[in-house]
Amino acid sequence: MTTAALLESPWHPLLSQPATEAAIALLGCWLVRRFADGRVIRGRIVETEAYEAGDPACHGYRRQTARNRSMFGPPGQVYVYQIYGRYHCINLATEAADLASAVLIRALEFPDTEAIAGAGPGRLCRFLAIDRQLDGSWLGPTSPLDLEAADYPLGTLIQTTRIGLTRGVDLPWRWYLAESPAVSRRDRRAEAEQMGVSV
């Protein structure tokens, strides 16, 4: 997909926002995975994390490298990286080209599938066969990955801190849909404060 075509994408306005705003706007949307054999799998986005320039936990905090280049791509470019030598994580570049800004898709809820399949970035990437080969690709109707709009009410949105970090640990830049069984890790204290329930 060309940059001009990307600018015409219906998702460009959503992903042109700062990561902290796009991360919320993506909740409830469907991540679409298309395979070469014609199969299509859709997962509802139920948990996200934001990473922005100036955030010490952001992969692009210091500089652009060959590994994190796609994070600096125009909004809608796919950034896939590997952790622990075996798990992959999918992110969507946001805000503007040449800026380190992206949303990590942390959990997906797949219809008619056990919740564990999408409960965490490594699990969802394994289920969708997402790896480094898709790094640098674009969201779009003819691409292996795309988005579809949310088609029913989101329910209760919880905001809390991100997971598995040693820097930027206090930033409340993780959001999830409380009613989804696919959320990778719940914050019961945040749920109590934001939903008015006891822990």
From Swiss-Prot:
One of its GO terms (molecular function) is alkylbase DNA N-glycosylase activity. It is an enzyme of class 3 (hydrolase). Pfam families: Pur_DNA_glyco. Coiled coil: none annotated. Keywords: DNA damage, DNA repair, Hydrolase. One of its GO terms (biological process) is base-excision repair. It comes from the Bacteria. SUPFAM superfamilies: FMT C-terminal domain-like. Its EC number is 3.2.2.-. Belongs to the DNA glycosylase MPG family. HAMAP family: 3MGH. This is Putative 3-methyladenine DNA glycosylase. It comes from Synechococcus sp. (strain ATCC 27144 / PCC 6301 / SAUG 1402/1) (Anacystis nidulans). The lineage of its organism: Bacteria, Bacillati, Cyanobacteriota, Cyanophyceae, Synechococcales.
